[in-house]
């Protein structure tokens, strides 16, 4: 049985001059560029209400794009009874607080045991929504808030809201190093040229913007609040590593333990045992896809980050006289 795909969005001004298939692949990252090219050639794409069958057609920015296509369902994912921490639910959306060690969508190395499998068990009708209603993702070991659409119209509207940057996502993190001020990282991100599971800053990458401000200083670590303007894969992790302040625990992007001089064995042990990136999606704000009402949710940092921060705070108090930046 074929699955119908209906998508609408507006081309960003930042995509001026891109090929149509390239622009659409950026706008709808859950679909490959080759699939999108096929849809264009098969006249399944409207640009400003007009059929367009030329993948090489250049976009100007601001065009209204609509896709109405079908995908042959090659895989039926299994519903699995995996607990979900549901923060909010109505007829159109779910907001969940994702724990660590939980992948969002099945893929290589993770064929099941994901948020998607849990959603299929919790709300079986969501099987009729592409990707079981998943609108955006969090990395396996990133915790926090995610919105899920329960209907196709809700998903279409939420995806469009993401493209228009109408959804606000804020994170808490702990970075390595003493940071003196907040700021913005505006650096494009693409897949790493040799490590295909990694991302990296690259001049030919997709635009990526991360804003950050300082919440608390420790001896050689900094607690941050960050806001995404875009949503590239591993964006916060890559951007913080790029400015030489990788996240604590992020072994992919350089966040290996770096205890301060004279740290207690207990604190060193706490640092070494923290085996994930210290990153939590703490706030989500959006306009409801049906009512249009602005809604906002908050999720406190999980216990492992609480313990990490408490240990850093205690270390700071024990060595306050040795800190040279006070």
Curated annotation (Swiss-Prot):
It comes from Salmonella typhimurium (strain LT2 / SGSC1412 / ATCC 700720). CDD domains: PseudoU_synth_RluA_like, S4. It catalyses: uridine(1911/1915/1917) in 23S rRNA = pseudouridine(1911/1915/1917) in 23S rRNA. It holds the Pfam family S4. The gene is rluD. It is found in: Cytoplasm. Keywords: Cytoplasm, Isomerase, RNA-binding, rRNA processing. The active site is at residue 139. Binds ObgE/YhbZ (AC Q8ZLS5). Belongs to the pseudouridine synthase RluA family. SUPFAM superfamilies: Alpha-L RNA-binding motif, Pseudouridine synthase. NCBIfam families: PRK11180.1 (NF008385), rluA_subfam (TIGR00005). Its EC number is 5.4.99.23. One of its GO terms (biological process) is enzyme-directed rRNA pseudouridine synthesis. GO terms for cellular component: cytoplasm. Residues 18-91 form the S4 RNA-binding domain. Residues 183-203 are annotated as: Disordered. Its main location: cytoplasm. Responsible for synthesis of pseudouridine from uracil at positions 1911, 1915 and 1917 in 23S ribosomal RNA. One of its GO terms (molecular function) is pseudouridine synthase activity. This is Ribosomal large subunit pseudouridine synthase D.
């Amino acid at each position: 049985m074929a699955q119908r795909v209906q998508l609408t969005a507006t081309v960003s001004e930042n995509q001026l001059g891109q090929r149509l298939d390239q622009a659409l692949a950026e706008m709808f990252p859950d679909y490959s560029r080759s699939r999108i090219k096929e849809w264009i050639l098969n006249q399944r794409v409207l640009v400003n209400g007009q059929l367009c069958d030329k993948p090489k057609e250049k976009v100007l920015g601001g065009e209204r794009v609509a896709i109405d296509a079908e995908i042959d369902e090659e895989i039926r994912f299994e519903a699995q009874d995996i607990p979900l921490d549901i923060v909010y639910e109505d007829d159109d959306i779910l907001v969940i607080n994702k724990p660590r060690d939980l992948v969002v969508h099945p893929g290589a190395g993770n064929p099941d045991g994901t948020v998607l499998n849990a959603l299929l068990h919790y709300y079986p009708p969501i099987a009729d929504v592409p990707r079981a209603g998943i609108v955006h993702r969090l990395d396996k070991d990133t915790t926090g808030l995610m919105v899920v659409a329960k209907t196709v119209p809700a998903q279409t509207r939420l995806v469009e809201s993401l493209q228009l940057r109408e959804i606000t996502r804020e994170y808490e993190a702990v970075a390595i190093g003493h940071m003196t001020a907040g700021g913005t990282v505006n650096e494009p991100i693409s897949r790493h040229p040799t490590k295909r599971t990694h991302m990296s800053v690259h001049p030919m990458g997709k635009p990526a913007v991360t804003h950050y401000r300082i919440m608390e200083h420790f001896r050689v670590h900094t607690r941050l609040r960050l806001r995404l303007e875009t949503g590239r894969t591993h964006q916060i992790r890559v951007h913080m590593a790029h400015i030489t302040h990788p996240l604590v625990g992020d072994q992919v992007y350089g966040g290996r333990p770096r205890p301060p001089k004279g740290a207690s064995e207990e604190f060193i042990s706490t640092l070494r045992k923290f085996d994930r990136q210290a990153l939590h999606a703490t706030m989500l704000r959006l306009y409801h896809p049906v009512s249009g009402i602005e809604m906002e949710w908050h999720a406190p940092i999980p216990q492992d980050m609480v313990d990490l921060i408490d240990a850093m705070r205690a270390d700071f108090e024990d060595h306050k006289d040795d800190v040279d930046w006070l």
